Amino acid sequence: MGPLQFRDVAIEFSLEEWHCLDTAQRNLYRNVMLENYSNLVFLGIVVSKPDLIAHLEQGKKPLTMKRHEMVANPSVICSHFAQDLWPEQNIKDSFQKVILRRYEKRGHGNLQLIKRCESVDECKVHTGGYNGLNQCSTTTQSKVFQCDKYGKVFHKFSNSNRHNIRHTEKKPFKCIECGKAFNQFSTLITHKKIHTGEKPYICEECGKAFKYSSALNTHKRIHTGEKPYKCDKCDKAFIASSTLSKHEIIHTGKKPYKCEECGKAFNQSSTLTKHKKIHTGEKPYKCEECGKAFNQSSTLTKHKKIHTGEKPYVCEECGKAFKYSRILTTHKRIHTGEKPYKCNKCGKAFIASSTLSRHEFIHMGKKHYKCEECGKAFIWSSVLTRHKRVHTGEKPYKCEECGKAFKYSSTLSSHKRSHTGEKPYKCEECGKAFVASSTLSKHEIIHTGKKPYKCEECGKAFNQSSSLTKHKKIHTGEKPYKCEECGKAFNQSSSLTKHKKIHTGEKPYKCEECGKAFNQSSTLIKHKKIHTREKPYKCEECGKAFHLSTHLTTHKILHTGEKPYRCRECGKAFNHSATLSSHKKIHSGEKPYECDKCGKAFISPSSLSRHEIIHTGEKP
């Protein structure tokens, strides 16, 4: 068996046959010949360019070529090597199948095969589709073979034989690099690009490169907005048929892929594979920029955009930009109010399927992920990861504007809005806007009047569980958060954070109206109401109005006469915790609030504020 040459895998047309082809068919021929050649080059079988390929690349007719001109310089790889790559079939047949396969992809109605012509006058185009394959012979094959399983038609026995391998479990084409096997040679060729890193298909719109032309075609639909694959059940549309196929499983409710470790079931095997890495702790995908590792390649791809800062997806409604198209799609629902994902247990609806999935765990009550440091258990591994930062003190997310660092990226995102003034989450009831959706959710409970969280100690009720947790510390006297500067302790971490600014003197929040600066954004917001004279909080008992809801709450106690805050030192009772805190300083002699002008110290910030008016001459 001699050395393999390009002419062994080339398809030839006579002059009469060439004239029978229309423009699209001639282009198809050119593409197939060029593809056959590139595949041989890829395998190292062809070492020089045949004249036929040079002519085709220049757009010339192949008819000017003679048979002997197709011969490339002899290859050092003989066809014995080729037979090892193609067990049970000849390399020539493997490439000659491409023309027929390409025609089949054009669809039944558009399939046109050329009959053998005796002369130009007798030449006819056969358009009978698959049913007519038995009635004619093509330019390259003379017999017709049919698949017993699905009736697919082939013009060579080897092509038919190769097709039948698909119905068996045989995978004769093995990758030398990693050992992975495939049932088609073309799939092996495609697979090899993973090892070479070759990405020859580039998007003209954004410059992104792909290994496969099909992936590029799918990607282009992101820019055009085209979603040709539509679900018959819910009308949801997708850019790729594979995504539609995965989506359709949701409607069946089937979850055949079950995790042996925790029993969780999935509707896709790929999702189960990803899930298993949670249990193994495997993170094979590492970021070259920062060294962070991930258990999924898609997560690494998403992560890389943090370093590039790329945000190509912009909301037409508010101008906000996003790294990923799916996040933009979810974001748009904030503006439309659409919440398509509903919980079957409690009826609560969500804008994202991921939020619904997390919510559903609440009903299950399972907490698989336990903190080794404190024993606290969590429903999700991601929440455990975030929780661990409480113990380590790690704050990896830093604000470029003011340098403040945060434990969580979501907290940084919300914080940034304090600099921009952006408040995208608006209450439909009163029009009040917020920087975070969670703050809006908490606020909305105020309008319902519900206070489901009740203190067993004093009977006081709250509309948020977190508020009850904070309140309970008043009764226990627990103050776990201590200031390293002065030793003062607090029952809330947020109170300690606010307190620390007293020592640093930092006042990053400035009023544009009068120039007064504050160490907390919330204090600035409260202050601004002095200029607007806005008093939205009104007492139902006496009609008195207040700038702040906290002032109204404090005021209401005057009507009830309630004094739940008692000093352990002298037994005196107060209706506000802040008043009790100020009172305690009388016993301790502590005066932490000092006047910058004269050095006089006070036990409370309000006393200092009143004193400072002496220096300014301000008459409120």
Curated annotation (Swiss-Prot):
Where is the KRAB domain positioned along the sequence?
4-75
The biological processes this protein is annotated with in GO are: regulation of transcription by RNA polymerase II; transposable element silencing
Per the UniProt entry, the signal peptide is none
Subcellular localization is given as: Nucleus
Name the InterPro entries for this protein: KRAB, KRAB_dom_sf, Znf_C2H2_sf, Znf_C2H2_type
Keywords, alphabetical: DNA-binding, Metal-binding, Nucleus, Repeat, Repressor, Transcription, Transcription regulation, Zinc, Zinc-finger
Decide whether keyword Zinc-finger is in the record: yes
Which top-rank group of organisms is this from?
Eukaryota
Extract the SUPFAM superfamilies matched here.
beta-beta-alpha zinc fingers, KRAB domain (Kruppel-associated box)
Q: Where are the zinc fingers (C2H2-type)?
A: 145-167, 173-195, 201-223, 229-251, 257-279, 285-307, 313-335, 341-363, 369-391, 397-419, 425-447, 453-475, 481-503, 509-531, 537-559, 565-587, 593-615
Quick check: keyword Transcription regulation in the entry?
A: yes
Cellular component GO terms held in the UniProt record: nucleoplasm; nucleus
Q: Which SMART domains match?
A: KRAB, ZnF_C2H2
Gene Ontology terms, MF aspect: DNA-binding transcription factor activity; DNA-binding transcription factor activity, RNA polymerase II-specific; DNA-binding transcription repressor activity, RNA polymerase II-specific; RNA polymerase II cis-regulatory region sequence-specific DNA binding; zinc ion binding
Please tell me where this protein is predominantly located: nucleus
Additional info? ZNF93 is only present in primates and evolved to repress the primate L1 lineage until 12.5 million years. Evolution stopped when the L1PA3-subfamily of retrotransposons, that escape repression by ZNF93 through the removal of the ZNF93-binding site, appeared.
Q: Family assignment?
A: Belongs to the krueppel C2H2-type zinc-finger protein family.
Q: What is the stated purpose of this protein?
A: Transcription factor specifically required to repress long interspersed nuclear element 1 (L1) retrotransposons: recognizes and binds L1 sequences and repress their expression by recruiting a repressive complex containing TRIM28/KAP1. Not able to repress expression of all subtypes of L1 elements. Binds to the 5' end of L1PA4, L1PA5 and L1PA6 subtypes, and some L1PA3 subtypes. Does not bind to L1PA7 or older subtypes nor at the most recently evolved L1PA2 and L1Hs. 50% of L1PA3 elements have lost the ZNF93-binding site, explaining why ZNF93 is not able to repress their expression.
Instruction: Name the PANTHER family on file.
Output: ZINC FINGER PROTEIN (PTHR24376), ZINC FINGER PROTEIN 721-RELATED (PTHR24376:SF210)
Protein name, UniProt field:
Zinc finger protein 93
UniProt source species:
Homo sapiens (Human)
Q: What gene is it encoded by?
A: ZNF93
